[in-house]
Amino acid sequence: MTIQDLKKSENFFLLAGPCVIEGEDMAMRIAERVVKMTDKLDIPYVFKGSYRKANRSRLDSFTGIGDEKALKVLKKVRDTFGVPVVTDIHGPEEAEMAAEYVDVLQIPAFLCRQTDLLVAAAKTGKIVNIKKGQFLSPGAMRFAADKVVEAGNSQVMLTERGTTFGYQDLLVDYRGIPEMQTFGHPVVLDVTHSLQQPNQTSGVTGGMPALIETVAKAGVAVGVDGLFMETHEDPTVAKSDGANMLKLDLLEDLLVRLVRI
């Protein structure tokens, strides 16, 4: 798969799925439903699921069902529904392993400056989606993208996921979307993570899911190339990031409203 495949529709493309792979059955149910709604709306779709969550607030937080088991779930989604899949990697040693199962390697925001990680992802030949660090300006992301390109891989996407605003909040500066697009790579808006409220004293990240539609509409209106949204059948029992995920039952109606913009 190439980035050109994601740009085949006049609509934005969508990266969506659970924050982390919690089990095969749930992942397959979510994928099946999102595939049906995106096919109907002519939205190019990439199934999203982290095979492991390396960045959790507390040691006792859920991190995954096991690397190989979760990666095999992602491969089953791809093989069953014929859609590409994306997952995060956290160190250079993970790039080649994950690339055997997925189509897009995602670089977490906190790791977006890690040269060895970016180069390792680039060398797999997969699409590399680099999330903008909450601490970086949009302009600084040019250098992260250049690392991947200079390592021999032009298949790069950049994702806006909010900028730190005080100790426990994030804001999206929509000016950054067209600015990053000038670098020559598609730009994605991570709607749900942009609504996180991190660093809570409870050790569990908060969120403002009621604003998902507002943030998504603004991104589409600005002209973002793709949207990233984590979704779950019941966010209240999700094992990671439930506080800012979109309930799956609400996704199709939201997409209908977004494609009208």
What residue ranges belong to the model's regions?
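Alpha-helix-loop-beta-strand connector modules within alpha/beta enzyme cores
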Residues: 32-41, 60-86, 121-127, 177-187, ...
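Catalytic beta/alpha-barrel core
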Residues: 65-66, 80-94, 103-116, 127-138, ...
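Glycine-rich, proline-tolerant flexible connector loops at the mouths of alpha/beta enzymes
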Residues: 15-27, 45-67, 231-241
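N-terminal amphipathic alpha-helix/helix-capping segment at the start of soluble metabolic enzymes
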Residues: 1-15, 72
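Conserved beta-strand positions in the central sheet of alpha/beta enzyme cores
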Residues: 15, 46-48, 86, 106, ...
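Catalytic alpha/beta core domains of metabolic enzymes, predominantly
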Residues: 7, 125, 129-231
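Glycine-rich phosphate-binding active-site loops on the catalytic face of alpha/beta enzymes
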Residues: 20, 109-111, 212-215, 222-244
